[in-house]
Amino acid sequence: ELQEVVVGGAFQGQRRAINSQKNSLGIKNVVSADQVGKFPDSNIGDALKRISGINVQYDQGEARFGQVRGTSADMSSVTINGNRVPSAEGDTRNVQLDLIPADMIQTIEVNKVVTPDMDADAIGGSINLVTKNSPYKRFISATAGTGYNWISDKAQLNLGFTYGDRFFNDKLGVMLSASYQNSPSGSDDVEFVW
């Protein structure tokens, strides 16, 4: 005998992302965590390559730098919640996107046209990463992934854990996220010197 089956889903993030994209005055792509979670992307660099108009530069097999509209990566700006992210390298503006775990981001906003309310230092466009907010109900999420790098002949491991809750009559919200990525890289490299 067939029992009742109830299937539920939460697409609020995707609905908000589509509304934000539709109501934008400029050319803007918004991708929610719902969409990012459909793919096995361990970092933001991997998630960005799925957005139209975005290209990523690879370094040692990792999607490291984001390019907007075909311009160089240092002609685009990267912000987290609207605050500028500095480069880990001292001589360039490129932001290493492979260092930012995808589990910690709620929404990716890609502005392909700089508007008057934005800094005028991003010729290609800007990438804004919006972090997760604390939910109104307890939220626990764990992810795990593994792989094998044939060049370095070593195993890869990706782990993620996210916890969110509100306390004291919803006056204090907490969102904790931890991520571990062990990706032993290796490359077959040939460089020519002229």
Language-model regions: role of each:
Residues 1-37, 73:
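Short, acidic, small-residue-rich periplasmic hinge/interaction motif at the N-terminus
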Residues 10, 111-113, 130, 143-149, ...:
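Outer-membrane beta-barrel pore domains and translocons
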Residues 12-14, 73, 85, 147-149, ...:
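Structural signature of outer-membrane beta-barrel domains
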Residues 44-47, 64-67, 79, 95-98, ...:
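N-terminal periplasmic accessory domains that precede
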Residues 45-84:
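Extracytoplasmic beta-strand/coil segments of soluble accessory domains associated
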Residues 66, 84-113:
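Short acidic/polar hinge/loop motifs at secondary-structure boundaries
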Residues 76, 136-140, 170-174:
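Outer-envelope beta-barrel architecture signal
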Residues 145, 168-194:
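Periplasmic-side early beta-strands and strand-to-turn transitions of outer-membrane beta-barrels
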